[in-house]
């Protein structure tokens, strides 16, 4: 039975990643560029391949990603979320392993909004006693 290509969406902060997994040689393409070309930081690259390594699919699947919004760190997290969802669609047996590692859960942390009467979300203006 041939493995079908499947599309999934991953999100983190303001970033959205549309991920497509295809049987192949392990190439990861993000917005038409290679992973090494797109991400300068080694930690971002490590974040991407974590789910593939966990289920031993590294080098067996090609990953095509369209990432938009947010910064590079948020996009890396969104891509990891998308890859995890795609792997579960590919093989439902991967779900418990990926869920235990925390890759199936959408990271809900986001920037706290700025409040009025303050310079930021939590910071206060300088207090003068006299």
Swiss-Prot record:
GO CC, sorted alphabetically, is: cytosolic small ribosomal subunit
* Intrachain S-S bonds: none
From which domain of life does this come?
Answer: Bacteria
Q: Does the keyword Ribosomal protein apply?
A: yes
Q: Which biological process annotations from GO are given for this protein? A: translation
Give the record's keywords alphabetically: Ribonucleoprotein, Ribosomal protein
Matching SUPFAM superfamilies: Ribosomal protein S5 domain 2-like
The Gene Ontology terms for molecular function here are: RNA binding; structural constituent of ribosome
Gene3D superfamilies reported in the protein's UniProt record: 3.30.230.10
Signal peptide (UniProt feature, chain positions): none
Which family is this sequence assigned to?
Belongs to the universal ribosomal protein uS9 family.
Q: What is this protein called?
A: Small ribosomal subunit protein uS9
- Native source organism of the sequence: Anaeromyxobacter dehalogenans (strain 2CP-C)
